[in-house]
Amino acid sequence: SYVFQSDKIAHSSYSKALCAAATMVPYTTFSSALDSLVDLCCNPKQTPFYCFVYLADIDSMGHRYGIASDFFSNAVIDCWKLIENHYWTPLRKSGKRIATLFTADHGMSPVDPDKTLYLNNSFPSILPALKKDTQGRILAPSGSCRDLFLHVQEEKLLEIASFLEKKLKGIADVVLTKKMMKEGFFGVASERLQQRIANLVILPYYKEAVWWFEKNRFEQHFFAAHGGLTPQEMESICLFLPHV
């Protein structure tokens, strides 16, 4: 199997771990990735083979400018134009029968940087109850503004959960991570995951954002985000064509 990713993320720790068993094909432009993909489809080294091609531009424009912006719309249009010109057309001419699946790994919720609730600023009383590392620094934040995970001292967990549930009423759900594990949100939770994951998670409602503030380190500048459990984030498209 082959993974085509932007050279900006192809060699990240996450990519190396997730794609360890595949051949990584870094690219500088999406059009060049599609050209390489077609070449591989027309001249496979072995069959069957699988190719995964990831385009981050649509996601990036959504984050930076919002999903109602022209930047986002143009990124979607440009994506399909490039696919038509650099994938569909040359592949049709080749006569190769290649099954193709299109999907987005998530949707998005609009968020407003100016209306983001910064948990540590809004409720500083919870800070002493959070776990710290060996250097005495609070273990926060984890996740994102759409799924903020907190490492709470076990003896304070229920107290903090109850406090935040009241304070965030109408803004977010506050859920024990163990409850989500039992309900299958993390699949089969490995022992390592259970040891490392935070024990409390804040899941903002649609259009809400809850994050952590540290100037020039942790700030919320996005106009759309994902990670929560709203249908707009969780549901996606899946287009399958048996062959071109």
Language model regions located:
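Feature captures the catalytic ectodomains and active-site-proximal regions of enzymes
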Residues: 1-244
